[in-house]
Regions:
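Hydrophobic alpha-helical transmembrane segments
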Residues: 34-50, 64, 117-120, 140
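Interfacial segments of alpha-helical transmembrane regions
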Residues: 48-76, 137-140
Length: 233
């Protein structure tokens, strides 16, 4: 067995250890977590956070960087790596497909390397972490990105290796778009609404009350998922 074959086999075993459970409740949690509708309030709050705290002259540029991050992550995954690498998803892998648990029969597309969901999640989170510069915000959104990514393995549509590579790519692209933002605005002294008080504002000038509101919506979304999973059929 070559080193690559050994790595692939280890990835299969790790994936199967995460994939699925005997709990209908956790299957429902995963199903709700992957629902776009659940996260609409959080997305709106994130946009509100930017509008309230980014200098009006630079707001459009920041929003452009958000869009650019999503486009780069998505296209690099779907248009470059997946058709180039041709790595089958766990639900399509003939060696393990009969052992993979799915939710409501969803199996995804043919190829899964690397995970666009993981790349997008970590790309956006990285960009926001660098923009907001708040410890608790950073921890909360990183946890969100990790869960959002690993659930793709839980429902059987990505190997753990797909997730790890996607997360790394996302972090790099999020850092890259933030670097572009810094490059464009390097001579703008007013790019942040900077204030002296570290109690009321983050180091980049974001109001902590707005950050707290974002975190409340995030944990509120978690609560909706956990409670809603009790009633989902």
């Amino acid at each position: 067995m070559t080193e690559l074959q050994g790595l692939i086999e280890t990835d299969r075993l790790a994936t199967l250890s995460i994939n699925g459970s005997n709990s209908l409740y956790w299957d429902n949690v995963a199903g709700l977590y992957t629902s776009v509708i659940i996260w609409i309030p959080l997305a709106i709050t994130a946009i509100f956070l930017l509008i309230r705290n980014i200098n009006s002259k630079r707001l459009l540029l920041v929003l452009l960087m958000v869009v650019l991050t999503i486009v780069l992550c998505d296209q690099l995954s779907s248009s470059v790596f997946k058709p180039l690498v041709h790595r089958l998803r766990p639900t399509r892998d003939p060696y393990i497909l009969d052992m993979v648990d799915t939710i409501k029969g969803y199996r995804g597309g043919l190829y899964g390397f690397f995970s666009g969901h993981a790349a997008n999640s970590f790309g956006i989170v990285t960009l926001f972490i660098l923009l907001v510069k708040d410890k608790w915000f950073s921890i909360a959104v990183l946890v969100w990105a990790i869960i959002n990514s690993l659930i793709r393995t839980y429902i059987g549509v990505h190997f753990l290796g797909d997730i790890i590579v996607g997360a790394i790519v996302g972090c790099l692209l999020g850092s890259f778009t933030y670097w572009i933002y810094n490059l464009v605005t390097r001579n703008d002294r007013d790019r942040w609404n900077v204030h002296n008080s570290s109690i009321l504002y983050t180091s980049s000038g974001f109001m902590r009350s707005d950050v707290f509101m974002f975190l409340c919506v995030l944990f509120g979304s978690y609560s909706v998922i956990m409670i809603g999973a009790c009633f989902t059929i």
